[in-house]
Swiss-Prot record:
This is DNA repair protein RecO. GO terms for biological process: DNA recombination; double-strand break repair. It comes from Rickettsia akari (strain Hartford). GO terms for cellular component: bacterial nucleoid. The keyword Magnesium does not apply. Belongs to the RecO family. Gene3D superfamilies: Nucleic acid-binding proteins (2.40.50.140), Recombination protein O, C-terminal domain (1.20.1440.120). Pfam families: RecO_C, RecO_N. Keywords: DNA damage, DNA recombination, DNA repair. Transmembrane segments: none annotated. It comes from the Bacteria. Involved in DNA repair and RecF pathway recombination. HAMAP family: RecO.
Length: 237
């Protein structure tokens, strides 16, 4: 059987000499892995993580790993490797996709969201965009946070906390008696205009980190690339 799609290469692992297994996040078919051969300098350039490609997958049976062929559409590599923050953010994002998105599981609209993020990241790193990507990944895996209104009173003002149980925002008055048991809702997630302080970055990463660990990563074993990114942002970024 054959599958043709457009996708982003998110993983490349050596199999044997000049042969690799790539994983591609496709537009219409979810994650797909296939064996590729690098027979020239051109093919080495094509099969790089972050490249957007026309993707052809062929196998006798659907459950086989299959043979893959790609044609390059666009490469972001040159924009990412020259900036440590961009590179760490990119590595973190694709490591999360590999961990949280299952092979051949379709996610509607996720591909366009990923493309938009990569395009923006290639131009400039934005912490707000990064956190929104993590929140989107949580939502795509079934753990959407509702930060638009208070989960108790439904008011949309003075939102200050997030309940670790319901994943819903809480107003200051509702959450105050239980503040030691609640997560902080960073102000920048409520307004596109506000500047982001280092403390708010810490709060945001703590927020997504909590739900990643509670629902998706056993024994708090997150991808090393995300840990590297978080450490860099909180100490350098």
């Amino acid at each position: 059987m054959n599958i043709k799609d457009v996708g982003v290469i998110i993983s490349k692992k050596p199999l044997k000499e000049n042969t690799f297994i790539i994983t591609v996040c496709t537009k219409n078919h979810g994650l797909y892995s296939g064996v590729v051969k690098e027979s020239s300098k051109k093919s080495k350039f094509i099969y790089q993580e972050g490249n957007i490609v026309d993707f052809l997958w062929q196998a006798r049976l659907h459950e086989h790993i299959g043979i893959a062929k790609c044609e390059l559409i666009k490469s972001y590599t040159g924009y990412l490797i020259i900036n440590k923050t961009k590179l760490y953010a990119f590595n973190s994002i694709i490591s999360l996709i590999k961990e949280l998105c299952h092979e051949r599981e379709k996610h509607s609209n996720f591909f366009s969201f990923l493309l938009n993020y990569l395009d923006n990241l290639s131009k400039n790193f934005c912490f707000r965009d990064y956190i929104n990507f993590e929140l989107t990944l949580l939502a795509k895996t079934g753990y959407k946070l509702d930060l638009t209104k208070c989960g108790v009173t439904h008011v949309t003002t003075d939102l200050t906390y997030v309940s670790p149980k319901s994943a819903r925002a809480l107003s200051y008055e509702v959450g105050k008696p239980y503040k030691d048991k609640l997560l902080i809702l960073p102000k920048f997630l409520l307004s596109d205009d506000s500047e982001i302080t280092l403390e708010e970055k810490r709060q945001a990463l703590t927020l997504t980190n909590y739900f990643f660990n509670r629902y998706l990563f056993h024994n708090n074993r997150q991808p090393e690339a995300r840990q590297t990114f978080v450490g860099y942002i909180l100490n350098e970024g």
